[in-house]
Amino acid sequence: MRYNQFSYIPTSLERAAEELKELGFDLDLQKTAKVNLESFLRKLFFHYPDSDYPLSHLITKNDMDALSFFQSEQELSKEVFDLLALQVLGFIPGVDFTEADAFLDKLAFPIHFDETEIIKHIHHILATRCKSGMTLIDDLVSQGMLTMDNDYHFFNGKSLATFDTSQLIREVVYVEAPLDTDQDGQLDLIKVNIIRPQSQKPLPTLMTPSPYHQGINEVANDKKLYRMEKELVVKKRRQITVEDRDFIPLETQPCKLPIGQNLEIFSYINSYSLNDYFLARGFANIYVSGVGTAGSTGFMTSGDYAQIESFKAVIDWLNGRATAYTSHSKTHQVRADWANGLVCTTGKSYLGTMSTGLATTGVDGLAMIIAESAISSWYNYYRENGLVCSPGGYPGEDLDVLTELTYSRNLLAGDYLRHNDRYQELLNQQSQALDRQSGDYNQFWHDRNYLKNAHQIKCDVVYTHGLQDWNVKPRQVYEIVNALPSTINKHLFLHQGEHVYMHNWQSIDFRESMNVLLCQKLLGLANDFSLPEMIWQDNTCPQNWQERKVFGTSTIKELDLGQELLLIDNHYGEDEFKAYGKDFRAFKAALFKGKANQALVDILLEEDLPINGEIVLQLKVKSSENKGLLSAQILDYGKKKRLGDLPIALTQSSIDNGQNFSREPLKELPFREDSYRVISKGFMNLQNRNNLSSIETIPNNKWMTVRLPLQPTIYHLEKGDTLRVILYTTDFEHTVRDNSNYALTIDLSQSQLIVPIASN
């Protein structure tokens, strides 16, 4: 374990003493450090009628327990304080460590003993994470140190788990959206699942906009998947034009219906554990799936601003600007009289994507988004540089396939009976509009590009993204973060994992950092907290997070690739082609071992190479035919210890998100030896070699200069490492699988790898 503590707010002695007193710690500024420390330790053992017994189980030296120490005349020293601090945080002498000083250095322990600062040290210890993954104060509250009185209690700028999660209100309302996405002449209704504590105070809301939450249709999804085996189409030379079109909602009328009291209830919905954490701390949770999902009406428009509007309508309702009904019969309306109107959205992938889309509307009431692994341009999710390009792990998927997966109205037999014919018509229109034939950018994709509206974002934003996420690739967060207005508060966490959540990792206090931000933005708590704009997980060692200023630098280093002419054959034998098509992982294994059709260049680094931004391959290329696709991957190659990309469970249920509520495992990325790590990758239709909007011809056997931008990253290579460049054509995971008999030639003497370099 290593501490990377960003959430602690440095506190004055007077404020620390005041907060400790509010928690029931009987400390006195006039008493000695030793007396105050003993009083603190005894309070930790509030379950025991006699605190001598648990105190005797702590040690202060190899030959003395804590009870004996406090009964003695010995003075409090750094050695004693450090040993006791480690033990109350769950570290066991002789098991987790033998030499405390060395262990504290390894932990990067954030508290440094000063006898005159003992009150502040005690305050800091309570706000510091235990070995279990919870802060000490959260651990104590989870055991019942504070009663669940359904009121707010704060410590170090964070809300504590004092809301009763055994008596939650679970109810359903149906919000009227200014939409008619299925064109049936009726405004769409949006089902909203609400989970909230019983409280006399107006509650802020965490809203998870999740098209998955009302169920998914995997059968329809699998039937809709596309075959990737097809020839690369030769496109006509042309210029693509698109236009910015404002979304115009339909008109709605003020509701004059009576207020209803009898709401639909539910017992369970699949929840997000970060939401659960905040539910126990006085934040209502709502789950909304939007248009075209079970319980709602309308068509699944998948990514456009009509879909975004269906979530925006819910925020409008929370602020009294939209109508919600008790049921589809629309006999009674219901008001969000329990809400304070302030909303933060949460969730990963599609869920985080909807958060970004919502933020670009500038809707009042949306105070903050926490968007994890989020899409900012749907074209860049399903296409790349004029190519159909599947997200990692999902060859054959496209946006209309996702529509089939998430149009959960068809899971309700009655809805299927009444609406499937119209749904199929609209789905066919969507399939045509996305233009899988050419892979080109068009108006359909432009209408699903949130980057063009990034200037309208006014809420605080928090993004997390994995630099090994080849599903929602790093370009998605790179482009939105760099498009954000300079006037807003923004925070980016870049980790070394893949498409995963990070709130329950041991090495970073993400959960607590979000607590402070949400108390600021949604509860109006003045807490003087400042979180760095960007925090990056160091790839060279375990559990090390560093502050960074920018994602993407203008300083570059050009690396020569060699002097040879390299030939890349596109065609595979029939058996090999079928085998790779059946299992793209077999292709990846062959590619990284140098056994697939490829051109390979190894560069032995003579100095450190700190990459920050978008690597560009500038290549001199020619094709034997009038078509060609180019794929590239950059590897950190050679055996050494690296971070894995999937977090593993260190404990199974050590994190309690409330008071015995929604327990979850503590996780971390493993650090172990492997043979390589993908740093970046990229794909291009050579007909789009200049830009997305220009379709060029490819002259047979004529040299072309190509700039292939790869996925942005931050990655540190060290002197002596090998950087491997792999150039090839068909990628069996991502691109169309064209097995035609053409070849690309690369002139390495006229080619370079252009690397953005991080400054010291």
Curated annotation (Swiss-Prot):
GO terms for biological process: proteolysis. Its EC number is 3.4.14.11. SUPFAM superfamilies: alpha/beta-Hydrolases, Galactose-binding domain-like, X-Prolyl dipeptidyl aminopeptidase PepX, N-terminal domain. Keywords: Aminopeptidase, Cytoplasm, Hydrolase, Protease, Serine protease. It is found in: Cytoplasm. One of its GO terms (cellular component) is cytoplasm. It is an enzyme of class 3 (hydrolase). The keyword Disulfide bond does not apply. The active site is at 349 (charge relay system), 469 (charge relay system), 499 (charge relay system). The keyword Acetylation does not apply. InterPro entries: AB_hydrolase_fold (IPR029058), Galactose-bd-like_sf (IPR008979), Pept_S15_Xpro (IPR008252), PepX_N_dom (IPR015251), PepX_N_dom_sf (IPR036313), Xaa-Pro-like_dom (IPR000383), Xaa-Pro_dipept_C (IPR013736), Xaa-Pro_dipeptidyl-ppase/CocE (IPR050585). It holds the Pfam family PepX_C. GO terms for molecular function: aminopeptidase activity; dipeptidyl-peptidase activity; serine-type peptidase activity. It catalyses: Hydrolyzes Xaa-Pro-|- bonds to release unblocked, N-terminal dipeptides from substrates including Ala-Pro-|-p-nitroanilide and (sequentially) Tyr-Pro-|-Phe-Pro-|-Gly-Pro-|-Ile. It comes from the Bacteria. Its main location: cytoplasm. Removes N-terminal dipeptides sequentially from polypeptides having unsubstituted N-termini provided that the penultimate residue is proline. Belongs to the peptidase S15 family. Homodimer. This is Xaa-Pro dipeptidyl-peptidase. It comes from Streptococcus pyogenes serotype M5 (strain Manfredo).
